[in-house]
Amino acid sequence: MPEPSKSAPAPKKGSKKAITKAQKKDGKKRKRSRKESYSIYVYKVLKQVHPDTGISSKAMGIMNSFVNDIFERIAGEASRLAHYNKRSTITSREIQTAVRLLLPGELAKHAVSEGTKAVTKYTSSK
């Protein structure tokens, strides 16, 4: 009865060594794919509002999901509005209307005023 080779024991189920994202089979390193997030912007706003407060990575992940969700909702609503009015371009007007439709009361008013302020600042800096 032949004995199994002792140089490499059989790996347990599911414990196969996977090639990492940063390596190829021939050993050359590959550029890591960038993971885009809003974390630096969330952090900047946090420091403006509460300079002495930090944020955990879990909370940052939640904030990132929140920003992505709101972005998708506003973009979807603005797209629908442009389609209803037979327009092929989403302008600041569609975004503003989408914000008014999606956000409740006072929150919508503040969002619209901050958005208008940001657009004015951007156009004046050009």
From Swiss-Prot:
Top-level lineage group: Eukaryota
Keywords of the record: Acetylation, ADP-ribosylation, Chromosome, DNA-binding, Glycoprotein, Hydroxylation, Isopeptide bond, Methylation, Nucleosome core, Nucleus, Phosphoprotein, Ubl conjugation
Residues recorded as bearing ADP-ribosyl glutamic acid in the entry: E3
> Where are the N6-succinyllysine modifications?
K35, K117, K121
Which residues get modified to Dimethylated arginine? Answer: R80
In-chain residues carrying the UniProt-annotated modification N6-methyllysine: K47, K109
Q: Which residues carry this modification: N6,N6,N6-trimethyllysine?
A: K86
Q: Which residues carry this modification: ADP-ribosylserine?
A: S7
Tell me the subunit arrangement: The nucleosome is a histone octamer containing two molecules each of H2A, H2B, H3 and H4 assembled in one H3-H4 heterotetramer and two H2A-H2B heterodimers. The octamer wraps approximately 147 bp of DNA.
Task: State what protein this is by name.
Answer: Histone H2B type 1-B
Lineage of the native species? Answer: Eukaryota, Metazoa, Chordata, Craniata, Vertebrata
